């Protein structure tokens, strides 16, 4: 039986909030079977918990925010992507502010931290959401589409008419597995345009943004001295974002995902469209690990 996963032990770290610019503590704690992914605001008294649920998502500026009444946890997509990449089902994430720390702008640091906690199998079957028929979400010329597929394939295309974005590197496809995610996707950093930064900071946004946690792009190209980690790092990061956004449905999805200029809002709308009709999907488990179309890292 393919089993649910959590961590063996608590892992603690800290980083800078992308928008606040303040230090944020983040702790990863084991969670119970079928507990799902839960964010806990420990800076509040009493602490407030918010389930990682697509129906609680509100988009802020270029990030996904979980909102429960007047409490939010923002910039969750990179840590959610790492959790999905390792196949973790149940986890409590404590944060000391209203946003998850940005780390280096990728999911790589979160992969490292989670592995320090050691993956632990639980005595319950791992659940998957299998898409049974095509579902789409459209906004203007942007689109996000699920079609039935034996596995989890992500095809993504961005469209930037800019010297930094070579045409041949604006599309990418991956067949999702832990190995592919860790080595080919998790290190791809978020990116932004330098011309937007002054405006954002004037509006108390992106106060923590720097070339240590993002790829900066000016009128001619990439500003970072080290350049890109991958020739197609921009589109790989959009895949990273999509993996995190789509994991907010509560379980790993079995389907093909096609995104064209899709962002957090459209990815979330796609999940809502799936959930609007129960005939769009079914919950499946695998008694034999060999029958699972998605390969995860082995748990010792």
Swiss-Prot record:
Pathway: Glycolipid biosynthesis; lipid IV(A) biosynthesis; lipid IV(A) from (3R)-3-hydroxytetradecanoyl-[acyl-carrier-protein] and UDP-N-acetyl-alpha-D-glucosamine: step 2/6. Zn(2+) binds at residues 78, 237, 241. One of its GO terms (molecular function) is metal ion binding. The active site is at residue 264. The keyword Lipid metabolism applies. One of its GO terms (biological process) is lipid A biosynthetic process. Belongs to the LpxC family. Catalyzes the hydrolysis of UDP-3-O-myristoyl-N-acetylglucosamine to form UDP-3-O-myristoylglucosamine and acetate, the committed step in lipid A biosynthesis. This is UDP-3-O-acyl-N-acetylglucosamine deacetylase. It comes from Acinetobacter baylyi (strain ATCC 33305 / BD413 / ADP1). The gene is lpxC.
């Amino acid at each position: 039986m393919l089993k649910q996963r959590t961590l063996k032990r608590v892992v603690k770290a800290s980083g800078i909030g992308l928008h606040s610019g303040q230090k944020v503590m983040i702790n990863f704690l084991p969670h119970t079977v079928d507990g799902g992914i839960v964010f806990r605001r420990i800076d509040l008294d009493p602490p407030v918990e918010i389930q990682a649920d697509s129906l609680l998502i509100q988009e802020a500026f270029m990030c996904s925010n979980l909102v429960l009444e007047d409490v939010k946890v923002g910039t969750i997509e990179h840590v959610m992507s790492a959790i999905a990449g390792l196949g973790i089902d149940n986890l409590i994430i404590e944060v000391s502010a209203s946003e998850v720390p940005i780390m280096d702008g990728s999911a790589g640091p979160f992969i490292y931290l989670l592995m320090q906690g050691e993956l632990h199998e639980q005595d319950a079957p791992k659940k998957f959401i299998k898409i049974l028929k095509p579902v789409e979400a459209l906004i203007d010329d942007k689109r996000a589409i699920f079609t039935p597929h034996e596995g989890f394939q992500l095809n993504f295309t961005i469209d930037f008419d800019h010297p930094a974005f070579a045409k041949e590197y604006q599309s990418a496809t991956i067949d999702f597995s832990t190995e592919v995610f860790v080595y080919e996707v998790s290190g791809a950093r978020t990116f932004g345009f330098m011309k937007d930064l002054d405006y954002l900071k004037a509006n108390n946004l992106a106060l923590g943004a720097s070339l240590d946690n993002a790829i900066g792009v000016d009128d001619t190209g990439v500003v970072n001295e080290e350049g890109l980690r991958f020739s197609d790092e921009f589109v790989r990061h959009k895949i990273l974002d999509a993996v995190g956004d789509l994991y907010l449905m509560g379980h790993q999805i079995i389907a093909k995902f096609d995104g064209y200029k899709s962002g957090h809002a459209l990815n979330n709308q796609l999940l809502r469209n799936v959930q609007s009709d129960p005939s769009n999907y079914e919950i499946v488990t695998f008694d034999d690990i060999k029958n699972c179309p998605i390969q995860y890292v082995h748990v010792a």
